[in-house]
Design a protein with these regions (language model features):
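N-terminal beta1-alpha1-beta2 module of alpha/beta enzyme domains
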Residues: 1-66, 70-72, 167-168, 350-356
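Alpha-helix-loop-beta-strand connector modules within alpha/beta enzyme cores
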Residues: 53-74, 128, 330-343
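Active-site mouth loops of central-metabolism enzymes
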Residues: 9-22, 77-85, 164-174, 232, ...
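Flexible, glycine-rich active-site loops centered on histidine and acidic residues
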Residues: 2-20, 80-146, 189-203
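An alpha-helical appendage that flanks or caps ligand/catalytic pockets
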Residues: 124-159, 200-308, 341-357
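Glycine-rich, proline-tolerant flexible connector loops at the mouths of alpha/beta enzymes
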Residues: 39-63, 78, 110, 194-197, ...
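Conserved, mostly hydrophobic/aromatic
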Residues: 3, 36, 44, 63, ...
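Hydrophobic faces of well-ordered beta-strands that scaffold small-molecule active sites
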Residues: 3-5, 40-42, 72-74, 102-106, ...
């Protein structure tokens, strides 16, 4: 299995320069490469402080110029918000600029607020995503192609910007049965967020994935999937709870956007407590926060029980410390991972990885 670093690029203080957030994401990506992380992930969201990155493919292209080895990936391209021909060409260009290091993370979207402002239909987003992926696969396997779907039509077309090694590896985000079915049918790697939950939730999601794959007659002994986890390495209780407060902030915004209950004051979303919200103290008991030994023990438990092929760490959340995020990357590589490997052995040999070297 392998590890990644996730960049949401949100902010909590009004007037935060977006340029700073882009630069901090870039520097975390560079450090993640030095620390041996396998993938750097970049989110896409629009129209609020929840996330200031409207184009993860632009972040891929930018970070490709300052890195050499690390894979670069949207998490995710919100497919129905794009014009098909332009999106496909930009995927090909991003892969070329990164010398074939693109992993294409896709999603169908979940925020009505975004879809309304793009004039897009959230109700048909999953079927739109499938049609768009039909077109991507045709564009990168044939010199020319045409398409006549329920949502999209394209006359005979050549996409000139082609990926280095043909079709990029595809990961798909979401925990619904519909997303599972797409992953099974197309051979994509599913990924989901662990949110504020502990290992039991991740195991439950793995079991749901296994059920979907088994229903389709697929072998689940080598099931590959990715999970996103919060990570903050510190011996300070104050820093731990400041970080957890920012995790809760981010989850509150996401929950409000999902439920269509967002309230904005200009660019800033108001924080609305989630239904059945757990306390920061409870969060501290099962998230990957705290000192090196605590995190290593919890991570070992999560890996051994849930057996993910990839874990992406969300290190800088809301208004949490950039410097603490950098420190956490370094301590994960130098101290936490070796402690986990003392118990589980070399993690590159543990479980299943879909990532090609």
């Amino acid at each position: 299995m392998h590890f990644g670093q996730f960049n949401l690029m949100g902010y909590r203080e009004r007037g935060t320069p977006t340029q700073r957030l882009f630069h901090e994401a870039r520097e975390q990506t560079k450090l993640a490469e030095e620390a041996g992380f396998e993938i750097a992930w970049f989110a896409e969201h629009h129209f609020s402080n929840y996330c200031v990155c409207p184009s993860p493919l632009m972040m891929v292209a930018h970070c490709a110029a300052v890195t050499n080895r690390i894979k670069l990936a949207p998490a995710v391209v919100v497919m129905p918000l794009y014009s098909p021909a332009r999106l496909i060409a930009e995927i090909g260009m991003a892969d070329g600029l990164s010398d074939g290091r693109l992993i294409l993370g896709i999603g169908s979207g979940y925020q009505p607020y975004e879809f309304e402002r793009f004039g897009a239909e959230l109700s048909s987003s999953k079927s739109q995503t499938e049609e768009l992926m039909d077109m991507v696969e045709l564009a990168f396997s044939k010199e020319t192609f045409s398409y006549n779907g329920s949502h999209y039509q394209l006359p005979e077309t050549h996409i000139s910007a082609q990926p280095v090694n043909g079709m990029p590896e595809i990961w798909i985000a979401g925990d619904s049965e519909d997303i599972h079915k797409i992953a099974v049918k197309r051979g994509y790697t599913p990924m989901f967020a662990g949110r504020m939950h502990g290992v039991d939730y991740i195991v439950e999601q793995r079991n749901r994935l296994e059920s979907s794959f088994k229903s389709a007659g697929k072998d689940t002994s080598e099931l590959a999937f990715g999970v996103q986890r919060f990570l903050c390495v510190t011996e300070s209780r104050e820093e731990t709870f400041q970080y957890l407060d920012n995790c809760r902030h981010q989850m509150r915004l996401a929950s409000a956007l999902r439920r269509r209950e967002e309230v904005l004051n200009g660019a800033m979303m108001n924080e609305i407590p989630m239904p059945d919200e757990i306390s920061l103290e409870e969060m501290s008991k099962h998230l990957l926060v705290g000192d090196v030994e605590t995190i290593a023990e919890r991570l070992t438990n999560e890996i051994s029980k849930a057996r993910p092929s990839h874990i992406m760490f969300h290190l800088q959340v809301g208004g949490s410390s950039y410097q603490l995020a950098l420190k956490s990357i370094e301590l994960f590589a130098s101290e936490i991972k070796p402690l986990v490997e003392k118990v589980l052995g070399p993690l590159e040999e543990f479980g299943i990885s879909t990532i090609e070297k």
